[in-house]
Amino acid sequence: MELSEIKRNIDKYNQDLTQIRGSLDLENKETNIQEYEEMMAEPNFWDNQTKAQDIIDKNNALKAIVNGYKTLQAEVDDMDATWDLLQEEFDEEMKEDLEQEVINFKAKVDEYELQLLLDGPHDANNAILELHPGAGGTESQDWANMLFRMYQRYCEKKGFKVETVDYLPGDEAGIKSVTLLIKGHNAYGYLKAEKGVHRLVRISPFDSSGRRHTSFASCDVIPDFNNDEIEIEINPDDITVDTFRASGAGGQHINKTESAIRITHHPSGIVVNNQNERSQIKNREAAMKMLKSKLYQLKLEEQAREMAEIRGEQKEIGWGSQIRSYVFHPYSMVKDHRTNEETGKVDAVMDGDIGPFIESYLRQTMSHD
């Protein structure tokens, strides 16, 4: 890359950041941060823990936007200063370092812009992610377990905390179901892109004849709603509460006491399990919170369908639709059928490198909004 081209890129980044700044209202955000931090310094701040945590989360979200912008602007200023130095006295090594910085900077701006776009009403929430194998016994149960690991690795790389809330192992291998609580800013905003059916094509390790098999597993993702977000009343007569022994990765008291909880909500048919906590009381509280989140999400989806009918829109059916194929044989390819994003790096994807698929889907849906 010639010096003149490097300079054009730096100038373009400066223009991009100026445009971004114009939409941010940084001064107002910094005022809000100051107000939140004054609240956090009050001696009675933790009297209402739910409200306190909400203020902390909002403050952290604002600081991420403000500090993210300032960091990007400082990097552009540094690149500009380095270019000026090269004009005064050329140095090949310095020029190569600057060229690499210019190349890498685009990805940083793209990531920052994507975070700004995650401004849906629940995008900032934690996420509840469930995996269920399709028909096919051990083969599909093993596929669900592979997806379980993929999402764990993705969340680890994103800095999200993963709690296994419920885990039901397969008969021979894999899992029959798993429920994860994924904690982190914008966890739902990112992971909502994964809702749908995932298809695997491979030579089965469970088939002695070495035949090719196709397996399916479904992924469901809903926001983990805060109690003050949910206006849902549950009639005690509408639910059945059962206890059972914890059965796997999530249970800390495995096969010792019946601390795990299953709640069945009869009007909706929704069933939730929780075995993550040591005590039955805490598992019941967590399960009720999850049930409320699911019922609230159901209510929101019904409202969205009603609005779509009023507007006369044809909505895409998300649940039950195949969103992505993972082909291990006869060639290596992972392809998202919604965006046509694809890669031949199957091993990297299964190790959690699904960011490009999520980002391309989010950008596509945002451009259609």
From Swiss-Prot:
Signal peptide: none
Matches recorded under InterPro entries: PCRF, Pep_chain_release_fac_I, Pep_chain_release_fac_I_sf, PrfB
Domain of life: Bacteria
Keyword rRNA processing on entry: no
Posttranslational mods: Methylated by PrmC. Methylation increases the termination efficiency of RF2.
Residues annotated with N5-methylglutamine modification: 252
Record key words, sorted: Cytoplasm, Methylation, Protein biosynthesis
Additional information: The gene for this protein contains a UGA in-frame termination codon after Leu-24; a naturally occurring frameshift enables complete translation of RF-2. This provides a mechanism for the protein to regulate its own production.
Free-text function comment from the UniProt entry: Peptide chain release factor 2 directs the termination of translation in response to the peptide chain termination codons UGA and UAA.
Chief location: cytoplasm
Family label: Belongs to the prokaryotic/mitochondrial release factor family.
Cell membrane is among the record's keywords: no
The protein's name in its UniProt record: Peptide chain release factor 2
Swiss-Prot/TrEMBL GO biological process terms: viral translational frameshifting
Organism lineage string: Bacteria, Bacillati, Bacillota, Bacilli, Bacillales
Source species of the chain: Staphylococcus aureus (strain bovine RF122 / ET3-1)
